[in-house]
Curated annotation (Swiss-Prot):
Compositional bias ranges of the Low complexity kind: 51-128
Family affiliation: Belongs to the Mediator complex subunit 30 family.
Name under which the protein is recorded: Mediator of RNA polymerase II transcription subunit 30
Pfam families: Med30
Keywords (A to Z) from UniProt: Activator, Nucleus, Transcription, Transcription regulation
Record-level GO cellular component terms: mediator complex
Region feature (Disordered): 1-22, 51-148
Organism of derivation: Aedes aegypti (Yellowfever mosquito)
Residue ranges the record marks as coiled coil: none
Function: Component of the Mediator complex, a coactivator involved in the regulated transcription of nearly all RNA polymerase II-dependent genes. Mediator functions as a bridge to convey information from gene-specific regulatory proteins to the basal RNA polymerase II transcription machinery. Mediator is recruited to promoters by direct interactions with regulatory proteins and serves as a scaffold for the assembly of a functional preinitiation complex with RNA polymerase II and the general transcription factors.
Length: 306
């Protein structure tokens, strides 16, 4: 019987002894695969399936629990297969059989430990993803909210800041108008040469650019005025220019106080003025009549002398 097999196979069970070597058994135990080498049919497909399950077990926690149950079921000893194996073994394989009997006791413990580690790692990954915040930043939500609130407060300008910006805008508008007047003062009519045409075109472009900028500044000034008017509780009332800028050479006039007595006195004054005007008219008529009468008397006296 020994001559029918190659030198590497000393017995009919030599190939089974090679697969049951201690190095192969340790690698399989580290991978968490149950000890199925003592069975008659060594199924490589089952080993590959178990390896794929172990690789996928680090990502999902559900399959790991099912795999641990399958491993425990597969790790239960099968007395029928053990008896069959004992009948087919030869005396030269006693040492290998002893190792195989010790390895089934170690492999369930290693498989359960590997399954527990996979389940715990999957649970940690699930909790890490559900939490939404990285491990190094446990309180990132409140910090972000406080930063956003501070940014909103910084963006809100008070009334004094808006007035200062409006003053700077007015000064910018005045300076740009001065530049426009300076450019218009220096413009000369084109003389027909290329240099004259180019210079006039350049000045025209500068003037247009200045007017475009002035238009934008006026829009900005209007927005600032509306913002200040909204912030003011009473609103921005119109004030006379005379009260802000006193005119030189103009006498100061006290504005009358509009009271009931003042209104009555004003009405009486108007009535008296009308009466005086009527009396003046009557006196004028009387004077005219007296003049005519005197003229007639003088005429009669002159005719008698003749």
């Amino acid at each position: 019987m020994s001559g029918q097999y190659p030198s590497g196979y000393q017995s009919p069970s030599g190939h089974r002894g090679n697969f049951n070597s201690p190095m192969m058994q340790q690698q399989l135990n580290q991978m968490g695969v149950p000890n199925q080498m003592g069975m008659m049919g060594f199924n490589q497909g089952n080993v590959m399936q178990n390896q794929q399950q172990m690789q996928s077990g680090g990502v999902q926690s559900g399959p790991d629990i099912g795999m641990g149950q399958n491993i425990q079921q597969q790790q239960q000893p099968n007395p029928s297969q053990g008896t069959g194996q004992g009948q087919q073994q030869q005396p030269g394989q006693g040492q290998a059989q002893g190792q195989q009997q010790q390895n089934p006791q170690q492999s369930p413990q290693l498989g359960m430990a590997a399954g527990g580690q996979a389940v715990s790692s999957a649970a940690q990954s699930a909790t890490g993803t559900v939490g939404g915040a990285p491990p190094g930043q446990p309180n990132a939500g409140p910090v972000a909210s406080t930063q956003a609130a501070s940014n909103v407060q910084q963006k809100e300008f008070n009334l004094l800041t808006l007035c200062r910006i409006g003053q700077e805008t007015v000064q910018d508008i005045v300076s740009r108008f001065q530049e426009v007047f300076g450019l218009l003062r220096g413009i000369q009519p084109p003389n027909g040469t290329n240099a004259g045409l180019s210079s006039s075109n350049d000045k025209k472009a500068k003037v247009q650019e200045q007017f475009r900028t002035i238009r934008l500044l006026f829009k900005r000034l209007r927005l600032l005025y509306d913002k200040c008017n909204d912030n003011c509780q009473q609103g921005m009332e119109y004030t006379h220019v005379e009260s802000l800028i006193p005119l030189k050479g103009e006498p100061e006039r006290a504005e009358p106080i509009h009271t009931e007595e003042y209104k009555k006195a004003l009405q009486e004054n108007r009535e008296l003025i009308e009466i005086v005007m009527l009396k003046n008219k009557q006196l004028r008529e009387i004077i005219d009549k007296i003049r005519l009468t005197i003229w007639e008397i003088n005429t009669m006296l002159s005719m008698r002398r003749c």
